[in-house]
Structure formats: C-alpha cells, structure tokens
From Swiss-Prot:
Catalyzed reaction equations: CMP + ATP = CDP + ADP; dCMP + ATP = dCDP + ADP
Classification lineage: Bacteria, Bacillati, Bacillota, Bacilli, Lactobacillales
Gene name linked to the record: cmk
Source organism (scientific name): Lactiplantibacillus plantarum (strain ATCC BAA-793 / NCIMB 8826 / WCFS1)
Keyword hit for Transcription: no
EC number: 2.7.4.25
Binding-site residues for ATP, renumbered to this chain: 12-20
Location within or outside the cell: Cytoplasm
A biological-process GO annotation: nucleobase-containing small molecule interconversion
Molecular function per GO: ATP binding; CMP kinase activity; dCMP kinase activity
HAMAP family named among the record's database cross-references: Cytidyl_kinase_type1
InterPro entries cross-referenced by the UniProt entry: Cytidylate_kin (IPR003136), Cytidylate_kinase_dom (IPR011994), P-loop_NTPase (IPR027417)
Keyword Kinase among UniProt keywords: yes
SUPFAM superfamilies hit by this protein: P-loop containing nucleoside triphosphate hydrolases (SSF52540)
Protein's name according to its UniProt entry: Cytidylate kinase
C-alpha cells in the first residue's frame, strides 16, 4: 500500500514563492502547512518589541521563553500568533523583514525552532518551507524541492505584494535588499541556504504560481505511488 502522509520540504531564497506555493500544495493534498519563516519572523518581532539587541543570542533566548508561537486557520492565509496577539501583518513589515536574517543566524535560536518544527512534522502529511528544511530540519523528508528565481523577478513579486499591503518601497531598493539577504543566508555559519543533494530544483522565474504548484504536485503524486 502506498504511503500517503509524506513530509514535503520546500526551500529557496527570499521571495522565490515558497510560502505561496507551499500553502497551495498543502491545500491540494490536504496536508498541514507550517510556515517556518513566520516562526523566525515571530521571534524577530518579539525580540524587537522587547527592545532586545538582536545580535545578543542570550538575550534573544531569554525573550523567547515568554513567547509561544502558534498558527490558526485564516482566510485567505493562516494567522500567526505570538501568545494571544495576532502578528500576521506585523511580521511582514519591512523592519522585521530586514532583521530576520540576524535572528536566523543565531545557532541556539535555530536549534529551538528546529525542534519545534520537527515535532510538528512527526506525523507526516505536512508541507514545510524555509531555508534549510531539506538539509537540516527534515533531512529525511520524502519530497524535497528547491525553488529559485532571479533577484529581479523576486523583487518584482515583493513589490507587487507590498503595493497590495500599502507598503511603498522602491523596486531597486527591494532588489538590493533581496540580494543582501541572499548573501547573508548563503554565507551564515549555521545552516546556510543550500540545495539538498536529493532536492529537485525548480526555477520559477518564467512560471506562474499554478504551473509551479502543478509541477510539485506531480512530484508528490509520483512519490506517493512509489513509497511503500
């Protein structure tokens, strides 16, 4: 009998479309979606609210002790909570976006969140996206996808998202921020952004969201039929 409840890991750089695609893939297969990036953003937001030095790992860890991150169903997107506070919109603001790489580079923070993410994935039937899901968080995931797109294309996508949210940031600035974040994510000492050796590379630059979802769904369906 084919195994149905797979672990699906989707990795890639900032604004490659991971979250959007992961949500749609999860919905198609009736899987649970875990936004690991939102968890790092939640820690970043929480630490900033506590006026913590984001480079001070001990202080960030202390702040995390009073933080419980949770996800709840929402329409169209799931909601993210810090304790009882809805921070769904707050964690997507530029100040959080531009500081999350600092938090993500802290080894103990990654260890704590990685354990939480693994617990969520234990039962299978889960889609998780981030920077190091296939390499570190879920190294044994049955399906691993690495999404990429050009920095210019990713900047255009981020710009369009920001316009809808009423955020006015010049396109050139967004591309510069994305390129800087790529550098930070790929050169950090702990769990740098890298493609797992057994991951399937999908370049989304010329593709629509529906085309990307269809391509990944095909990979999952094939794996479901071959995993006993």
């Amino acid at each position: 009998m084919a195994k149905q409840a797979l672990q699906v890991a989707i990795d890639g750089p900032a604004s490659a479309g991971k979250s959007t695609v992961a949500k749609l893939v999860a919905k198609r297969f009736g899987y649970i979606y875990v936004d690991t990036g939102a968890m790092y953003r939640a820690v970043t937001y929480w630490a900033m609210q506590q006026h913590v030095d984001l480079a001070d790992e001990a202080a960030v860890i202390t702040a995390m002790k009073s933080l419980k991150i949770s996800f709840k169903p929402g329409e169209p997107d799931q909601l993210v909570f810090a304790n009882q506070e809805d921070i769904t919109a707050a964690i997507r603001q530029p100040d959080v976006t531009n500081n999350v790489s600092t938090i993500a580079a802290l080894p103990q923070v990654r260890t704590i969140l990685t354990e939480q993410q693994r617990e969520m994935a234990n039962a299978g039937g889960i889609v998780m996206d981030g920077r190091d899901i296939g390499t570190t968080v879920l190294p044994n995931a049955e399906v691993k996808i690495f999404l990429v797109a050009s920095a210019a294309e990713r900047a255009k996508r981020r710009y369009a998202e920001n316009v809808k949210k009423g955020i006015d940031t010049p396109l050139a600035q967004l591309q510069a921020e994305i390129e800087l974040r790529d550098h930070k994510d790929s050169t950090r000492k702990v769990s740098p952004l890298t493609q797992a050796t057994d991951a399937t590379l999908v370049d989304t630059t010329p593709m629509s969201i529906d085309e990307v979802v269809a391509a990944i769904a095909k990979i999952i369906t094939k794996k479901q039929s071959s995993t006993i």
